[in-house]
Amino acid sequence: MTESNRLRIAIQKSGRLSTDSQQLLKSCGVKFSINEQSLIAHADNMPIDLLRVRDDDIPGLVMDGVVDLGIIGENVLEEEQIERQTLNKPAEFVKLRQLDFGACRLSLAVPTEFSYADASSLEGLRIATSYPNLLRRFMQQKGISYRDCMLKGSVEVAPRAGLADGICDLVSTGATLEANGLYETEVIYRSMACVIQSTQTQTPSKQALIDRILSRVNGVIRARESKYILLHAPTETLDQIVALLPGAENPTVLPLNDDTNRVAIHAVSTEDLFWDTMEQLTALGASSILVMPIEKMMG
């Protein structure tokens, strides 16, 4: 493949999203090594280049056709999308799928001594945020006027530093808010990581590679969400046992050697098999119950 036909994928340079993105690509069979001194990593076994950039640069790189794919948080993507709509600037991309990592929420938070009833409690106050567009959209929908304080980092210290009355920031556990004398009041946006693709014209070979990678991503996520279940069951309670298997579709039932009263059941379950379910299976006569992770799935 020529340089122009190499697939360019933008991922976050550092942080949790970077680690999870790299692990996902490696699980899809893309072999590469990261040199912390370099912003580009070349795959060893596929015509793929990984560009390691700041997360808020990824949507623009995809929308402008500089890269072909990007792995990004939906919050950052939505922030850029609103910005471009405001500026009447094109955003040529499609979201291929949501991923199973990068969960977070964008929330309003105020000092612990603040009496908060609803979002209208912030009328006319100053709110610090790194996501001015998402905040503005939410407040406009609520019909609330406010003053914003744009910060690129350390938003949670703004009230204590006298820069703002409240904040709008990403929350995971809430521990950072608590450490800074704040409490979460309202979630304005929930986010996961996602894969986006530029809609600018792709060569047939590059699009085929994108489709191939996406198929593998789908398989990896399906495998992570599934478990392989094996057990022995008496034929007289077979239907009841199959009905108990969570999310299982068409389990395989096999005869056991020298035992006409019992069968082996193999099933792929898309839900967790909890201890109480296993105890119910045992009560119905099931034995040798094994629940195993699945590394890869396809088809």
From Swiss-Prot:
Family to which this protein belongs: Belongs to the ATP phosphoribosyltransferase family. Long subfamily.
Reactions this protein catalyses: 1-(5-phospho-beta-D-ribosyl)-ATP + diphosphate = 5-phospho-alpha-D-ribose 1-diphosphate + ATP
Keywords (A to Z) from UniProt: Amino-acid biosynthesis, ATP-binding, Cytoplasm, Glycosyltransferase, Histidine biosynthesis, Magnesium, Metal-binding, Nucleotide-binding, Transferase
Gene Ontology CC, one term: cytoplasm
InterPro entries, alphabetized: ATP-PRT_HisG_long, ATP_PRibTrfase_cat, ATP_PRibTrfase_CS, ATP_PRibTrfase_HisG, HisG_C, N-reg_PII-like_a/b, N-reg_PII/ATP_PRibTrfase_C
HAMAP family the UniProt entry points to: HisG_Long
EC number per UniProt: 2.4.2.17
Molecular function terms, GO-annotated: ATP binding; ATP phosphoribosyltransferase activity; magnesium ion binding
Activity-regulation annotation: Feedback inhibited by histidine.
Name the UniProt record assigns to this protein: ATP phosphoribosyltransferase
Cofactor: Mg(2+)
PANTHER family documented for this protein: ATP PHOSPHORIBOSYLTRANSFERASE, ATP PHOSPHORIBOSYLTRANSFERASE ATP-PRTASE
UniProt function note: Catalyzes the condensation of ATP and 5-phosphoribose 1-diphosphate to form N'-(5'-phosphoribosyl)-ATP (PR-ATP). Has a crucial role in the pathway because the rate of histidine biosynthesis seems to be controlled primarily by regulation of HisG enzymatic activity.
Subcellular location: Cytoplasm
One record GO biological process: L-histidine biosynthetic process
Source species, domain of life: Bacteria
Pfam families referenced in this protein's UniProt entry, alphabetically: HisG, HisG_C
